[in-house]
Amino acid sequence: MRIFLCLIATTLSLFLKGEWPQFRGPSGNGHANGTGLPLKWDEDTNIKWKTAIHGKGWSSPVIWGKQIWLTTATVDGKKLSVLCLDRDTGRVLLDKKLFEVAEPQ
């Protein structure tokens, strides 16, 4: 799941111009206006960059300007963090723990 989120965010950021502010895209309907989208990708094909993240992906990526924002959580759900990645390079710009709970619900 960790690499998957980064791969999806990377693939989207390569071909989409503009922002991706919410789950399922700009209009919330799963449609994107990009052109030349790849029909195939894997670990090495049509991937611009990869960035390992800690925990597991906990949200849809948000793409805004030159940044990709996402949240991660530990497997036990006790810690939630927010990450900001550089859209062009995948470099981590911010990695901040948002909160920690003793007993997740």
Outline where the language-model segments fall.
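Sec-dependent signal peptide recognition
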Residues: 1-8
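Hydrophobic h-region of N-terminal signal peptides that target proteins for export
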Residues: 8-17
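Noncatalytic, solvent-exposed loop/strand surfaces
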Residues: 16-105
